[in-house]
C-alpha cells in the first residue's frame, strides 16, 4: 500500500496481486477505480485486460473482477472528480506515442479531466528535462528503468508523490525509464475525500 486515507472504505493507492484463480464478488465502486495492469491478465465484465491495459471505472460502476493466471495491478481507489464519469479502456501496447517537450521524451496521454492529467512517459537513455514546478503535485510509478532527479535515483517499482508546488529537474541515465505519471490531483476535489 503506497497511500491510504480512511478506514474500511478508503481512498487508496496500492499494488494489488491476484493469485491464479482469484475471483471476487460483483461490487460497486461508488467513488471510482483506476487500474494499470502491470503483469498477467486481469478480467472483469468488460473482458480480459493484459499487461499494459489502463482502465478507469467511474463512480457508480460495478464489476466482478477475476484472474485465471494471476496478475499484478497498480490501483487507485476513490480518486475521481464527481463529474468524471467517462469509462476509459486503453491498451497501451497498441497506442501511438507522441513526441515529448524535449528530444528523448515520448508521451502517451491516458486521461485528462479538469486539470488532472495521467500519462505514460518514456525516457530515452540520457534524457534531461528542464527544472519545473507541479502546482497540483505529481505522482510517479517507475515501470521500467531508473528515473532520476536531483533528490535521488528511483528504480523500477518505485513510487513517488511530490507535494503541490514541488520542483525538480528529472533526468535518466544509461537505462532510460518508463513511468506512469499523474499531475494536478493533489488538492483537487475528489469523490474519495
Question: Model-predicted segments: where are they?
Answer:
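Conserved hydrophobic/aromatic beta-strand scaffold that supports enzyme active sites
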Residues: 1, 13-17, 34, 54-56, ...
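A short, N-terminal "cap"/entry segment at the start of jelly-roll beta-barrel domains
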Residues: 1-10, 70, 74-115
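Ligand-binding loop in jelly-roll beta-barrel domains
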Residues: 7, 48, 59-83, 164-190
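Short acidic-glycine-tyrosine-enriched beta hairpin
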Residues: 43-63, 148-168
Amino acid at each position: 500500500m503506497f497511500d491510504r486515507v480512511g478506514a474500511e472504505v478508503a481512498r487508496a493507492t496500492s499494488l494489488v496481486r491476484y493469485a491464479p484463480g482469484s475471483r471476487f464478488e460483483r461490487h460497486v465502486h461508488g467513488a471510482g477505480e483506476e487500474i494499470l495492469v502491470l503483469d498477467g491478465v486481469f478480467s472483469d465484465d468488460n473482458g480480459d485486460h493484459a499487461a499494459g491495459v489502463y482502465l478507469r471505472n467511474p463512480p457508480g460502476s460495478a464489476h466482478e473482477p477475476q484472474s485465471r493466471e494471476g496478475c499484478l495491478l497498480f490501483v487507485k481507489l476513490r480518486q475521481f472528480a464527481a463529474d468524471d464519469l467517462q469509462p476509459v479502456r486503453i491498451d497501451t501496447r497498441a497506442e501511438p506515442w507522441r513526441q515529448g517537450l524535449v528530444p528523448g521524451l515520448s508521451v502517451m496521454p491516458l486521461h485528462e479531466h479538469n486539470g488532472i492529467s495521467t500519462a505514460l512517459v518514456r525516457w530515452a537513455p540520457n534524457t534531461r528535462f528542464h527544472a519545473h514546478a507541479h502546482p497540483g503535485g505529481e505522482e510517479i510509478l517507475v515501470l521500467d528503468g531508473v528515473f532520476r532527479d536531483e533528490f535521488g535515483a528511483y528504480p523500477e517499482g518505485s513510487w513517488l508523490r511530490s507535494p503541490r508546488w514541488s520542483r525538480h529537474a528529472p533526468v535518466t541515465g544509461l537505462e532510460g525509464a518508463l513511468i506512469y505519471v499523474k499531475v494536478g490531483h493533489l488538492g483537487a476535489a475528489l469523490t474519495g475525500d
